[in-house]
A protein has these predicted regions:
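Well-ordered, non-membrane alpha-helical segments in soluble/globular domains
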Residues: 1, 33-39, 121-133
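N-terminal pre-catalytic "stem/leader" segment of glycosyltransferase-like enzymes
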Residues: 1-27, 114, 268-272
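Generic beta-sheet signal
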Residues: 26, 54-56, 145, 168, ...
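Leloir-type glycosyltransferase catalytic cores
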Residues: 65-102, 218-272
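Catalytic donor nucleotide-activated moiety binding site of glycosyltransferases and closely related
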Residues: 128-174
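A donor-sugar binding/catalytic signature common to diverse glycosyltransferases
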Residues: 176-222
Length: 272
């Protein structure tokens, strides 16, 4: 992205704010090397200036990357109001028919230091609340699946009937994928607040229960009272628009995603 911006003579500053119109940061996970980005986020958003967020993609992890305005997932504006069916095939995904492959309900955690989690309780409380809500409607077995880099220790799984914790295992044939696909081979539904596991489940034909912040909201369910009869809507139009949330490295270099984002910034976010 920086290479492209320089090639088009955009005025850019690295790690300094010279009264800039927009900030660009990597991720809204306020941890480690990304912790300083929180100050940038708060400074720009607090003064009404937009923040473009880059992060790892969910369609082709570490090959494609998301780029959105003022957030991630469904909270972001991806400048994808216009889209077609030409981009989705680039990600080489084939939808599996909607088909519950088993009887297990999988609850996927997220990282508690992410901006996406700011309005939620602790992960232990989240898992507990989900279990108790699901148990109002079914005694199907439940698997708790923590985020691979945010393991929840000492969760009292034995306190509940037919509940177990399944820790993600690294797939060493990939950069940092896990064995989530294996879990999907025996799954009734996936419960996930707003992160990528829901997307993987939908593509593989497993119904999902998500929040309004999830990119799978339009093809998912939001009320666990429907756990025994989840909706399984058409997915192609959703996928066509989703494909315009992620871009490949060469496209960043060519400026394709920036052209969309820049136009949207000027249209809606940058004060003139």
């Amino acid at each position: 992205l920086i290479d492209h911006l320089r090639s088009t003579n955009e005025k850019i500053y690295i790690n300094e704010d010279k009264n800039c119109d927009v900030a660009v940061i990597w991720s809204v996970l306020w941890q480690g090397r990304m912790q300083p980005n929180k100050e940038v986020w708060e400074k720009f958003r607090g003064t009404g200036r937009p923040v473009v967020v880059l992060e790892v993609g969910g369609l082709r992890r570490n090959s494609s990357f998301k780029m959105g305005i003022n957030g991630i997932n469904r909270e972001a504006d991806f400048a994808n109001q216009t889209y077609d069916d030409k981009r989705w095939p680039l990600f080489n995904h084939q939808f599996r028919p909607w088909n519950q492959t088993g009887n297990v309900i999988v609850i996927c955690g997220q990282h508690h230091n992410s901006h996406q989690w700011r309005e939620n309780p602790s992960l232990k409380s989240y898992f507990k609340n989900c279990i108790e809500e699901i148990r109002r409607y079914t005694d199907k077995p439940i698997v708790i699946r923590p985020h691979p880099r945010n393991i929840v220790h000492n969760f009292p799984e034995h306190k509940y009937k037919h509940v177990r914790v399944n820790l993600p295992k690294r797939d060493w044939n990939t950069y940092d994928d896990t064995d989530f696909k294996k879990i999907l081979s025996s799954t009734w539904a996936v419960v996930n607040h707003s992160s990528n596991p829901a997307m993987e489940a939908v593509i593989n034909g497993i119904p999902v229960f998500v929040s309004e912040k999830s990119l799978c909201h339009d093809v998912g369910n939001t009320d666990l009272s429907d756990i025994l009869h989840p909706a399984m809507p058409a997915r192609q139009n959703w996928a066509n628009q989703l494909a315009y949330t992620e871009w490949f490295t060469e496209e960043f270099r060519e400026g394709t995603p920036w052209a969309r984002i820049r136009a949207r910034l000027e249209e809606r976010y940058i004060k003139k």
